[in-house]
């Protein structure tokens, strides 16, 4: 824990709160330990442009809070700081607007039948989302297919090419595609 109010630098990122360090496979894993509201004020700024309207930031704060609280975590940390879970870039992503969005939605979460939902979100759906049961084994009534409203998104259409060897490595149980 640093007594410096400006935070603790790790590489190019600055963090508040406490840092726990673990050695895993000859690499150092840095885990930032802090309260959820401080965490969220950075997540909101990491997941979306902070110049967007405050109501959009508030919606992101609620979705991100729900998502974070729903995660089970592991014995080292609760949630990954990448797109695997939610992007968390430390203090550099925290702004007055993200702090305001998080404070004004404090404790608000998304529920279905009085339980936290699996509040998944994305930066781009590529035109349409899928029904949950078509992607995962579980059917969530609140995760149903809808068309994307934002055809101007630069990631609306994309492509990725794979070689036969890459597909075989990605899908070894079925010998590729």
Predicted regions and their residues:
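Conserved, single-site charged/polar hotspot
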Residues: 1-177
